[in-house]
């Protein structure tokens, strides 16, 4: 059975750090948890989400991160903070620009999703 719950984070554009606005997670200690991050840039938001999941007793070996597009910086950050994390991405781009967006990238995933 699949249980879907949510962690809502957005990036503070001045500090580039994640800000949590929603956390609705069940206790799923022995389940596999998929973290979906469409564009893995700095890895800060994904790392914060994984920390919240780990606080609920889930072991890193049971967490899988899935992204469409990733930057090397984000993968490095996740590896540093969550050594045994499984990371799956469709494509690895060059890196990040000054605003910490993936280049060449696809733009802002949240803006695209929300149509803004």
Task: For each feature predicted by the language model, list its residue ranges.
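PRPP-associated nucleotide enzymes
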Residues: 4-116
